[in-house]
Regions:
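Alpha-helical linker/hinge and terminal dimerization helices associated
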Residues: 26, 30, 34, 70, ...
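N-terminal helix-turn-helix DNA-binding core of bacterial DNA-binding proteins
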Residues: 28, 32-76, 81-82, 87, ...
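Charged, amphipathic alpha-helical coiled-coil/dimerization segments
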Residues: 6, 60, 82-145
C-alpha cells in the first residue's frame, strides 16, 4: 500500500528517504509477515487474532468497546468478527438494553486458539530481532519507547 510512498529503487536497491518512512516500511513489512505466519500457523489473520486475544481477557465485550480497545472503527470490527461465529470461535449476542448492540465472547475453541497466538508472535519477534545483538535490541527498545512517548503526548 505504501511502497511507492516509502521507498524508491536505484539500481535495484531500495533507498529509504528518511527514518520516518523507514519506520512505516518496517510496520507494513511486519504486518505482512505477521499475517502470513498467523494464516499459515492458525488459519486466521493477524487482525482476527488481535480480536481473539482481546476477547480472551474474559467476559463479554460489546463491538464498540472492542473497537476502542483495538483502536479501530466499529465497521472494521464488524468485518473482522463476521466470520468468527461461523468458525465457532466467537459468540455474538444482541445487547440487552439496545438490540442494535452486539456483544461478543469467546467459545472454548476460540479461547484455545487465542492461547496459541503468543507463541506465533514470539516466533515472529525472533525472526525480526533475532540477528540483533543484546545491545542493539536495548538501544532499539529505548529509542522506540521514547518515540512512542512522543507520539502519545497530547498536542495543542
Amino acid at each position: 500500500m505504501f511502497e511507492n510512498f516509502l521507498s524508491f529503487s536505484r539500481g535495484g536497491t531500495p533507498c529509504h528517504v528518511d527514518s520516518f518512512r523507514l519506520l512505516l516500511d518496517i510496520r507494513v513489512s511486519i504486518e505482512r509477515m505477521l499475517d502470513q505466519r498467523m494464516l499459515t500457523t492458525l488459519g486466521i489473520s493477524f487482525s482476527q487474532g488481535s480480536v481473539l486475544v482481546q476477547l480472551a481477557g474474559g467476559g463479554t465485550v460489546s463491538q464498540q468497546d472492542l473497537a476502542k480497545a483495538l483502536g479501530c472503527g466499529t465497521s472494521r470490527i464488524s468485518r473482522l468478527v463476521h466470520d468468527l461465529p461461523n468458525r465457532e470461535w466467537v459468540v455474538c449476542r444482541p445487547g440487552r438494553g439496545d438490540r442494535r448492540t452486539r456483544n461478543l465472547s469467546l467459545t472454548p475453541a476460540g479461547l484455545a486458539l487465542a492461547r496459541q497466538i503468543p507463541s506465533v508472535l514470539a516466533q515472529a519477534g525472533q525472526a525480526v530481532l533475532g540477528r540483533l545483538s543484546v545491545e542493539e535490541r536495548r538501544v532499539l527498545g529505548a529509542s522506540l519507547a521514547r518515540m512512542l512517548d512522543e507520539v502519545r503526548k497530547p498536542r495543542r
